[in-house]
Amino acid sequence: SVRHALKAEKIGCDAASVDGFECGGHPGEDDIPNMILLPRAFEELKIPFIASGGMGNGQQLVAALAMGAEGVNMGTRFIATKEAPVHQNVKEALVNASELDTELIMRPLRNTERVLKNDAVTKILEKEKSLGYDIQIQDIFGEVAGVYPKIMQEGAMDAGAWSCGMVAGLIHDIPTCKELIERVVSEAEEIIASR
C-alpha cells in the first residue's frame, strides 16, 4: 500500500516495492490494483519504487514505467523458469493456470493470501465459509503450515496452499531467466519505439 511505502521511506529505506492486489502471496487488505496503486505511489513517494504484482511481460514493464515505477518484480513469473529451484510440477501448474485460477484465503484472519486453487485451498475456503470470522489459524494449520517443501521440492501440488499471482494467466512457457529477461526488455523496447 502507499501507506506502507511511505513508512518505508520515513524509516530511511532507499527504495520500495509497491505490491498491487494482483500479486501472489499477501496483497494486504486494501485490494488496490496496480493501475491505481502505482500512480498513487508516484504521487506520494520521494524514493524510487518497483512495481510488484501481476508483472510478467514487456507490456507490463512499459505500463509500470509509465506509472512511475523504476522497474518490476516478477515473482510468480520467475518461478516458471528453468533455473527456479522448484519441482517441475509447480512450473507446469503455472503454465497451465489461467488468471482465474487463484483464490484469496485467510481474509477473516486479516492475513489475506493469493494462492493457486487446489484441494487444500478448497478445504480452507470451506472452513472459512463455515466458521466465518470465528476461524483461527489453528483451524487451517494443516493446509498452510510447513507445506512448502512438499509442494516446491516434492511436487505434491495438493499438499497445501501456495502463493501464486494472477499473472499465471500470462505464463505460457518455461524459459531460462536470461531468455525471460531478454524477452521482456525486447517487448518493452518494441512497444516504446512503436508508440
Model-based region annotation:
Residues G20-C23, K46-I47:
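Glycine/charged-rich beta-loop-alpha catalytic/anionic-binding loops adjacent to active sites
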Residues K10, G28-I50, G56-R195:
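Conserved active-site-proximal phosphate/metal-binding subdomains
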Residues R3-I11:
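Conserved alpha/beta-domain cores
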Residues D14-G20:
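Non-cysteine beta-strand/loop elements that form the S-adenosyl-L-methionine
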Residues S1, F21-E22, R77:
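Short, ordered loop/turn segments at secondary-structure junctions
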